[in-house]
Regions:
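Conserved positions in beta-strands of structured domains
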Residues: 88-93, 110
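Netrin-like (NTR/C345C) domain of secreted extracellular proteins
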Residues: 20-57, 138-236
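Sec-dependent N-terminal signal peptides of Gram-positive bacterial secreted proteins and lipoproteins
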Residues: 1-27
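Short aromatic-glycine-enriched beta-strand elements
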Residues: 95-108
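Short coil-to-beta-strand transition motifs
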Residues: 76-86
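Short glycine/threonine/proline-enriched tight-turn/helix- or strand-capping micro-motif at secondary-structure
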Residues: 59-76
Length: 236
C-alpha cells in the first residue's frame, strides 16, 4: 500500500513537471513575440517643434505632386536605399527648416532587411510636409504678398498643412516598412537623421504579414500589396 501511494505521488509530481515545462515553453514563445526593446537611441532633437493646430487656429492646406522617382518600382527603390527596415512608429512631430515643413518620425526598428541598423535601434526619419506656422513659411520664402488677404493677427494664428498628393497620414504605433537614405551633410536636417527615398518607399501594414504601397498617378491613387517574404527577397 505504501509503495502504491509513493508511485501515485511520483506520477503526480511528474505531471506537474511536464505541465510546468509546457507553461515555461509557452511563456518563452510569448516573450519572443513581445514588443522589441530599445537597444540604441539614435534619434535626433528638434530646434522647433510644432503641435497640431487647435480648433482656434486657421489651417490652409497645400498639396504637392508626388515624387515620381522610381515610384512604381519597389525593387529599384530598395536597391538605391541605404537601409530598408520594418518599424513601429513611436512619435510623430512637426518642424521646419528654412521655411520648409517637415515631419519627423521617431521609429523603433523591429526588423532589418538591408543596411547596418539593428533591431532595437530608435532613429529619426524625416518626410517633407506637415504643419508649419504661416509666419515661419513667410519668413523662409519672403512671400507675404501671397497672403495679403490675411491680417497680421490672422497670420500669427494660421498654419499651413503641406501634404503629398495621395499620401496617408502616419500615426503613432503604425507598423511600416521604410526605404531610407542617410541625410547628406549639406542638408539642413540634423546630423544622424534619415530620409525616405520616396514617399512610395513607405509601406503600410495591412494584416496577414502584408504591406501596401500607395502610388499616385495623375489624379488617381492605386495600391500594390506585397507579402513580407516577397519584400525580403527583393533585398537579397
Amino acid at each position: 500500500m505504501k509503495k502504491a501511494f509513493l508511485l501515485f505521488l511520483m506520477l503526480i509530481i511528474a505531471c506537474f513537471i511536464i505541465i510546468g515545462c509546457k507553461d515555461f515553453s509557452n511563456n518563452t514563445n510569448n516573450s519572443s513575440n513581445a514588443n522589441v526593446g530599445v537597444l540604441r537611441d539614435l534619434s535626433v532633437n528638434l530646434e522647433k517643434n510644432y503641435s497640431v493646430p487647435d480648433s482656434d487656429s486657421n489651417v490652409i492646406e497645400l498639396t504637392s505632386p508626388p515624387d515620381e522617382l522610381y515610384q512604381n518600382d519597389l525593387k529599384k527603390l530598395i536597391s538605391i536605399s541605404d537601409d530598408v527596415i520594418r518599424v513601429t512608429v513611436q512619435n510623430v512631430a512637426y518642424t521646419s527648416y528654412e521655411g520648409v515643413a517637415w515631419t519627423k518620425l521617431d521609429v523603433l526598428i523591429t526588423d532589418t532587411l538591408k543596411g547596418d541598423l539593428k533591431v532595437g535601434d530608435v532613429i529619426s526619419v524625416f518626410n517633407l510636409g506637415g504643419y508649419i506656422p504661416l509666419s515661419e513659411h513667410i519668413e523662409g520664402h519672403n512671400d507675404a504678398f501671397r497672403f495679403k488677404n490675411l491680417s497680421a493677427e490672422e497670420i500669427k494664428t494660421t498654419f499651413l498643412k503641406e501634404t503629398i498628393d495621395g499620401e496617408k497620414t502616419v500615426q503613432k504605433s503604425d507598423d511600416l516598412i521604410l526605404c531610407l537614405v542617410q541625410t547628406p551633410k549639406n542638408s539642413p536636417l540634423p546630423n544622424g537623421a534619415y530620409e525616405r527615398v520616396s514617399y512610395t518607399g513607405q509601406l503600410y501594414a495591412d494584416g496577414d504579414n502584408k504591406f501596401v504601397q500607395l502610388i499616385t498617378d495623375s489624379s488617381e491613387t492605386t495600391e500594390k500589396t506585397y507579402s513580407y517574404d516577397d519584400i525580403k527577397k527583393m533585398t537579397e
